[in-house]
Amino acid sequence: MSIGLVILVAVVALLLVVGYGTAVLMRKRNEALLQNLEERKEALYNLPVNDEVEEVKNMHLIGQSQVAFREWNQKWVDLSLNSFADIENNLFEAEGYNNSFRFIKAKHAIGNIESQIDLIEEDIKMIRAALEDLKEQESKNSGRVLHALDLFEKLQTQVAENADSYGQALAEIEKQLENIQSEFSQFVTLNSSGDPVEAAEILDKAEDHILALTHIVEKVPAIVEELTVKLPDQLEDLESGHRKLLESGYHFIETDIESRFQQLHASLKRNEANISALELDNAEYENEQAQEEINALYEIFTREIEAHKVVEKLIKNLPSYLAHTKENNQQLQKEIERLSQTFLISDTETSHVKELQAELSAQEDVVLSAVEDSSETKQAYSVVQEELEAIQERLKEIEDEQISLGEALAEIEKDDANARQKVNIYANKLHTIKRYMEKRNLPGIPDSFLEIFFSTSNNIEELVKELEATRVNIESVNRWLEILGNDMEQLEEETYRIVQDATLTEQLLQYSNRYRSFDDNVQAAFNKSLYVFEHDYDYAQSLEIISKALDLVEPGVTERFVTSYEKTRENIRF
């Protein structure tokens, strides 16, 4: 055998060995894939879908829910009977291909099986999700119905146990309970006949009616109690109180109280219709209106009762208060009479006291009448209170006026004493100012001073005449005092001004000697200033002439002399 042939045989043998090994490996790999697919199929088949279907089936669904269940149930039946069988056949066929080393067909078959299992897996997920949704929806529907029934039963029990508290509303409440019961019956009929949409609408209405009626049932007792117990009790109390007040002598400004009682009775009676019709908002409003009217009547009675207390107190206190003011007026009259012996009293004060006396007499008639007729008055106490309080307020005003008059009268003698003291002071001041001027040894007295001086002197004489009159006019005296005060102030200022101007002129004339010998302007000013000083007695003009001339040659000299003078000026010693 040639070497070439040997090599060829060896190569063929090697290829056969390699091919066989590869075939064995591929078959094992496909076996593993097929085993995995078998396990996936078994896992899907063993899911509790049948149990879930039976659970939903036993819920006895109706209407659209039942239609949906049938569709999903049929889908599951198709899967469990057909799809799984197909997969089983395909697995068996793929195993045959694999065992016979037909790997291409085996691979293709395995791919198809994987796709089938993936589709079945998705379908099962959808079926189970749909079944779960049906269970949840049914549970919700059942729970909703049970909840509504529970609320309805509680409402029925509540109404039955508290029937007396609903009054006129009970009949309408029971009627609405029957209507709700009918709605439940209608719901059951529609639901059983496979019309879930309309059944749901009926259930919605029933639930709404239950909630609304529950709210009504909770509100009615309080409104009924207000209408049938509280308001009638208050009205009865008002009518009883009104009778007692009338028997006790009370009167009222309002003349329609009895008719208002009748209107309240009618209003309460009419409001029963709102209760019967369950018009609770209207019923509450009518109750509130009735309560407001009752409160208004209570306020009327309370007003008169409180006014009676005030009237009794005023009747007790006003006579003594009136007597007090009358006594004050008598004292004022006596004081005016006493002062009239010495002073002229103004007609205003005299007439004021007389007017007060006349007013007090008129007030006395009213007060005494009120005191005497207090137990038999035909007026409402609030009216009497207003009248008596007005009198009391006026008496307070009169008392204040009396105090002011008394103070004014007391000032008359004080003003007289003050005037007599001041007239002496002013006379002494006038004499002192005269001596002060004389001591200055001036060449003459300016007319401005003499005019003020003699005017002041004349005014002092006039004041003395007023004070020496048989009956002193104190108003005139006070006017003269005011005039004299201004006169003395003006005279004192004029005196200081004249003396200052004269003194400074003399000092500056003497000071100018140091400049007159060589300054013609100063010499001329000296001559003119001296002439005015000695002949015109115009010391201010004289000072102005010499000061201007000196300030030209020695600026500030006049200011220096003025400052020095003010520090050493001699004051008038009164």
From Swiss-Prot:
Localization, UniProt: Cell membrane
Keyword Methyltransferase: no
Residues in compartment: Extracellular: 1-7
Keywords assigned by UniProt, alphabetized: Cell cycle, Cell division, Cell membrane, Coiled coil, Membrane, Septation, Transmembrane, Transmembrane helix
Gene Ontology annotations for the cellular component aspect, listed alphabetically: plasma membrane; septin ring
Topology relative to the membrane: Single-pass membrane protein
Coiled coil: 26-47, 105-189, 258-346, 375-415, 455-494
Any Gene Ontology biological process: septin ring assembly
Cytoplasmic side: 27-574
Transmembrane feature ranges: 8-26
Matching Pfam families: EzrA (PF06160)
Family per record: Belongs to the EzrA family.
Function (record text): Negative regulator of FtsZ ring formation; modulates the frequency and position of FtsZ ring formation. Inhibits FtsZ ring formation at polar sites. Interacts either with FtsZ or with one of its binding partners to promote depolymerization.
The name this protein goes by in its record: Septation ring formation regulator EzrA
Species this chain originates from: Streptococcus sanguinis (strain SK36)
Gene coding for it: ezrA
